[in-house]
Amino acid sequence: MSPRQPLVLVFLVLGCCSAAPRPHKPTVVVFPGDLRTNLTDKQLAEEYLFRYGYTQVAELSNDKQSLSRGLRLLQRRLALPETGELDKTTLEAMRAPRCGVPDLGKFQTFEGDLKWHHNDITYWIQNYSEDLPRDVIDDAFARAFAVWSAVTPLTFTRVYGPEADIIIQFGVREHGDGYPFDGKNGLLAHAFPPGPGIQGDAHFDDEELWTLGKGVVVPTHFGNADGAPCHFPFTFEGRSYSACTTDGRSDDTPWCSTTADYDTDRRFGFCPSEKLYAQDGNGDGKPCVFPFTFEGRSYSTCTTDGRSDGYRWCSTTADYDQDKLYGFCPTRVDSAVTGGNSAGEPCVFPFIFLGKQYSTCTREGRGDGHLWCATTSNFDRDKKWGFCPDQGYSLFLVAAHEFGHALGLDHSSVPEALMYPMYSFTEGPPLHEDDVRGIQHLYGPRPEPEPQPPTAPPTAPPTVCATGPPTTRPSERPTAGPTGPPAAGPTGPPTAGPSEAPTVPVDPAEDICKVNIFDAIAEIRNYLHFFKEGKYWRFSKGKGRRVQGPFLSPSTWPALPRKLDSAFEDGLTKKTFFFSGRQVWVYTGTSVVGPRRLDKLGLGPEVTQVTGALPQGGGKVLLFSRQRFWSFDVKTQTVDPRSAGSVEQMYPGVPLNTHDIFQYQEKAYFCQDRFYWRVNSRNEVNQVDEVGYVTFDILQCPED
């Protein structure tokens, strides 16, 4: 084995599925949001052989000898029967989940010997998938690391910040590292070899269905099963159920049995539902209230209106416009679709597709054989869809494979090895002797005698027991809701700022008007904040000049350094980002993440500081460093490297080397020395419409 650069699990699928002969060619539809392409067997083989280094560009033609030679190389590498033909076994191997690094030839590499030079490796779980409870995800990652610590001197310690060696992230599509995911059943995950910055990090595609390899894991609340997960399928009144149901209840609250036979065992719990609670937000875990009013319109279900990140939310009072209380709706992972253009939404049955009614998931219209459903009653009209739940991918096994790459391992050519390119589910011990030889070549054996790695995931995931009253039948309604939001949930917006804004200035005699140049200026919580050497003033524009301060920055944001370069607040999530040198701090209310290095955002070493930020709406922000800028995604907290632009071209008339770039009252300000240039965007054209003094014209200081 040899270390290589990022390792990407890929699921390639054929353009046609096995089916009985039909009198006519089946209709294949282009589904909105679907990145899969329909390929013939030969096209698939040519693309596969080229992508993984078995053929060259010039050979991608009708040259049968080149194709046969490439197939033999592939078959030899993957320990397949060496026929040189595009046979069934070879095609199945090409369809299987696997890493995307070439098997032959060179790939872009990082510098160094690509191993860690310390034995205590730290890791940080930056965010979570909604497919599994957080404690189950924590456990899966811990067991995946234990696979490698069992046979080496390495130890793995969880930390809670970006200083970690290995940062674990769930993301979708373009997530900031230049290796985008491509939706359901495409790229599963990738990892980078050991080293600084992004090296060592592991990313997982959040459009996949993450399970323990045997179907969805649905935690229960209340009932009489002490929080045990649902058991699918289960029997109720002689009928089999493979998802949560509202049958037997008059309040339409979904429930499930936690054993295979409710009729015999009578053990049950309630499935995640907005009827029980809404998570995160500022609604204190209370259930959704339907109908509720938002922007004058009545809503009787959860909605994504008003949000650009696709999260479903609801009001926890009857009038959001008045009370501003909300939460995010729990995802029904037992029935929620993945991928497509409606991830997280449940299937709607029956639905209309090409004029025909469907009451179950179908393969019709697809060339890859995957089951799908509409998430509205009429696909022909609404074009809303997703893939139906399946067994999913074992987060434990995929993580163990990816962490092998994060430790410096390349792929194995032994089919039984964990580091073999293709993913396969197993409940046995994941490590093969080839894996052990590879990792011990890098780090040596564990000093204890003959340790054994973990053998299998637990039969039941750890869960949090419900605090509600026990009940005896699913026909009975729970008498109390949960006391707070569940552990799992989106990372979306708490709306509250710090618990208390300071009201008493440090030194009221310290006049803001005597400051010539500020360290940073930013609009935060509807006030324009002026930062200088560990202090700040708040300014609001109204009748007369209204300035409060100075206040000590650590009294509001304790982790911040004395000198700031820039800051901004995201209007959707209410997260506040502070930049100083090559570091960034992210505050959500009183909670902070950081300092993080700028390279974790995707900004290279040439970016020595972030000199300003302009929110663009929709969770996007322009980050500036002198004469360059990049588009920053607040949700993934990464920049799009392809978005780099020139300030001179985008904002003509603005001087060189500006600082304190900020947005105020929907206009952009570029400061240089004591002056500012205000930019107004009319008809998508940026024009300087005002030049003035920061103190005299913005702060309305008197001219002495």
From Swiss-Prot:
Coiled coil: none
UniProt: Ca(2+) 2 binding residues: D165, G197, Q199, D201
EC number per UniProt: 3.4.24.35
Location(s), subcellular: Secreted, Extracellular space, Extracellular matrix
Cystine pairings recorded for this chain: C230-C256, C244-C271, C288-C314, C302-C329, C347-C373, C361-C388, C513-C701
Pfam families hit by this protein: fn2, Hemopexin, Peptidase_M10, PT
Chain positions recorded as Ca(2+) 1 binding sites: D131, D206, E208
Co-factor binding comment: Binds 2 Zn(2+) ions per subunit. Binds 3 Ca(2+) ions per subunit.
Taxonomy, superkingdom: Eukaryota
Glycosylation sites: N38, N127
UniProt cross-references to SUPFAM superfamilies, sorted A to Z: Hemopexin-like domain (SSF50923), Kringle-like (SSF57440), Metalloproteases ('zincins'), catalytic domain (SSF55486), PGBD-like (SSF47090)
Primary localization class, coarse: secreted
PROSITE patterns according to UniProt: CYSTEINE_SWITCH, FN2_1, FN2_2, HEMOPEXIN_2, ZINC_PROTEASE
One example GO MF annotation: zinc ion binding
Post-translational modification summary for this protein: N- and O-glycosylated.
Motif mapping: Cysteine switch: 97-104
PANTHER family: MATRIX METALLOPROTEINASE (PTHR10201), MATRIX METALLOPROTEINASE-9 (PTHR10201:SF30)
Family indicated by similarity: Belongs to the peptidase M10A family.
Assembly mode: Exists as monomer or homodimer; disulfide-linked. Also exists as heterodimer with LCN2. Macrophages and transformed cell lines produce only the monomeric form. Interacts with ECM1.
Listed name of the protein: Matrix metalloproteinase-9
